[in-house]
Each structure stands twice: as structure tokens, then as C-alpha cells.
Amino acid sequence: MMKITILFILLLTSSFAYSQDWPELGIYSEDNKKYAQSFENEDRVVFMGNSITQNWSTFLPEFFEGKSYINRGISGQTTPQMLIRFRRDEIDLNPKVVLILAGINDIAENTGPSTVKMISDNIISMAELAKENGIDVIISSILPAKDISWRPRINPQPKISAVNKVIEQYAKENGMIYLDYYSSMVDKNNGLITNYGSDSVHPNRRGYKIMSVLAEKAIFKVLNKN
């Protein structure tokens, strides 16, 4: 009985701790202090996202090395979590450009069911926050996914297509760049090309190489638009 009680208390404690930092603001809080000041000629770019962004630094570290690129991906996160931490992990780092890649975990219902409008609204809200703070915005498509291993009952394809359509239209109407990873990484079944993925959702090193080329082109375009 004592063991069960202790286990129950531990579960309650961990659950309470998680609820206190639902957007996971603590993950980058110390590292963010290094970026409180930016330099005049520094082309700082912050990458906001989930595990697809976070793992980029692991699978292809050379993409970030020697550049003013800051990775602020957090595994498993959904767009409402990102929206809450957007000021702390993006705006407060004083970037010239923010690159947003989000949505697949919303579709996977990691933090509960989400509609196309909920997902796209959150992405658009992040973009508008950046714009209001003088930061140029690159909005990325959700990558293709035929299925989601941790949510096998969900067919992600319809929502992926629908969200991508909404955010692409928004980007075009508001002078922002829409970064289309999807078209370069999709197979004939609307899934992630096998050679580009470590699973049906996450890119591997080869996939990140494709993404890096596309991201560099988009960043160059933004920084040289004038």
C-alpha cells in the first residue's frame, strides 16, 4: 500500500510540474541569455518548431555551425505551446528572420484535437507577432506524412494539405515567404519519401540536406529583398 501511495504522489508531482511549464519555457531559458544582444551586421535567424526542427542540429549540425542560426525546436510540441513561448524563444532573441515549421503534432493530437483553423490561426499569430516586432517571417509547409506512428488511427494527409493551403495563401497575401518543403519531399502516396525519412514523419540526414538547401534559399531571399 505504501509503495502505491508513493507512486501516486510521484505521478501527481510530475504532472503538476509539467502543467506549470506546459509550453516548456524552461528548456531554453538559460541559453536564451546568450542572445540578449545582437550585433548590427548580424543576420540572426531563429528556427521555431518541434522535433523536426530540434533534430536538425543532430542530423545535420553543419547547417547551423558558423552561422547566426538559433535552433528553438522542442520535440512533441504543438502550435499553442509554441505560441506561448514565441516571445521568449524568438522575439526576445532579436533575430532578423524567424522561420516557423509547425503543425504535425497538432494533427497528431499531442495536446488534444485540433482543427485546420486552430492550427493555421496559431501559425499566423506567430507570424503576426514577429511582423509587429520588425522581424521578417518565413512560414514553412508541414512536411508530408502518410501516417503517424504514435497515432495510427489518424490519417494526417487531409489536414496537412489543408493547413499548407491556408498558410501559403496567408504568406502570399502578407508579403511573407512560404517555404515549400512539401513538394520536394512528397512521394506518390502523399507520404514522406522513404529515403528522406527516419520514419514516416521525421527527416533523416538526407532529408535535412534537402530542407537545408530550400531554407538557405528562402533566408537569402528575405535578407536580400531590398
Residue ranges of predicted features:
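Sec-dependent N-terminal signal peptides
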Residues: 4-13
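Structural recognition of the beta-strand scaffold that forms the well-ordered cores
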Residues: 45-48, 69-73, 97-102, 137-141, ...
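Active-site segments of SGNH/GDSL-like serine hydrolases
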Residues: 101-107, 127-160
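Solvent-exposed loop/turn segments at secondary-structure junctions
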Residues: 51-55, 75-79, 104-109, 143-147, ...
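Glycine-rich anion/phosphate-binding loops
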Residues: 77-84, 114-122
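Charged, glycine-enriched surface loops/patches
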Residues: 116-140, 166-176
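Serine-esterase "nucleophile elbow" of acetyl-processing enzymes
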Residues: 17-97
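Catalytic His-Asp segment of secreted/periplasmic serine-dependent ester chemistry enzymes
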Residues: 143-226
